[in-house]
Regions:
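Alpha-helical cap/lid subdomain in secreted, periplasmic
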Residues: 60-209
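Residue-level detector of flexible, active-site-proximal loop/helix-junction positions
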Residues: 11, 42-45, 130, 175
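Conserved SGNH/GDSL esterase-like catalytic core that processes O-acyl groups on lipids
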Residues: 2-5, 13-101, 105
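Ser/Thr-glycine-rich phosphate-binding loops at phosphate-binding pockets of nucleotides
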Residues: 9-12, 191
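A short, surface-exposed helix-loop junction/capping segment
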Residues: 7-8, 138
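Residue-level preference for alpha-helix termini and adjacent loops
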Residues: 10, 45-46, 182-183, 187
Length: 209
């Protein structure tokens, strides 16, 4: 049986769906008759947070959780970055950073960790979906000083991933804008219809791997 790990945030976890059976992770497993593992935790970021969040679980960044994944998966999908833009306080950094002190460095560090446990052909990154207010330099409104907009986070993630010749599966255009979209519940999180759409896109992609 095919085994697939999904490392992500609240979208992967299934926030704003009506139940586990409506999450894209569950649906992919059902549609492919595969074992899918949901390593999504709401509020989490790829990069470590400097200032502690109200809930400790929100600070379990992707790097920490990647180390706790079951390593026998056939494929690993990493779906994140929107919270780094939204409310992450790690400096953005630059391409070439190798330590997780910056967003760029955390992406690089995560890739190198995954490459120690999986072949690069098994790893796929999913850039952030569109979201409401994605052009605001203040993220979700919690930033006290302006920073990069979502597109800059997404573009640099793609650039770093591609520099390792690792696959990117980008479904943001197929999913459409975060606002005034029947696939989204609140401008950020897809609803049941949105998760069904993501599952269908992922299944089509996985079948071609």
């Amino acid at each position: 049986m095919l085994k697939i790990n999904f490392l992500g945030d609240s979208i992967t976890e299934g926030c704003c769906t009506s139940g586990t059976q409506h999450t894209f992770v569950y649906l992919v497993g059902k549609m492919l008759n595969a074992e899918t593992r949901n390593y999504g935790v709401g509020g989490t970021r790829i990069a470590p947070q400097t200032k502690k969040s109200l809930e400790p679980i929100w600070d379990l960044d992707f790097i920490q959780r990647a180390k706790k994944m079951n390593h026998d998966a056939d494929y690993i999908f990493v779906f994140g970055g929107t919270n780094d833009y939204g409310h992450g306080d790690a400096p953005f950094g630059k391409i070439g950073d190798k330590t997780p002190d910056t967003f760029c460095g955390a992406v690089d560090y995560l890739i190198n960790y995954l490459l120690q446990h999986y072949k690069k052909e098994q790893i796929i990154f999913i850039p952030p979906l569109h979201r409401a207010n994605e052009d605001s330099p203040y993220g979700d409104g919690s930033r006290t000083s302006p920073a990069n907009i979502l597109k800059v986070y997404s573009d640099v993630l793609v650039d770093i991933v591609k520099s390792y010749d690792i696959k990117i599966f980008d479904m943001k255009e197929e999913m459409g804008p975060g606002e005034n979209n029947p696939l989204f519940e609140d401008g950020l999180h897809p609803n049941d219809l949105g998760h069904q759409k993501m599952a269908e896109l992922l299944v089509d992609y996985i079948k071609k791997l």
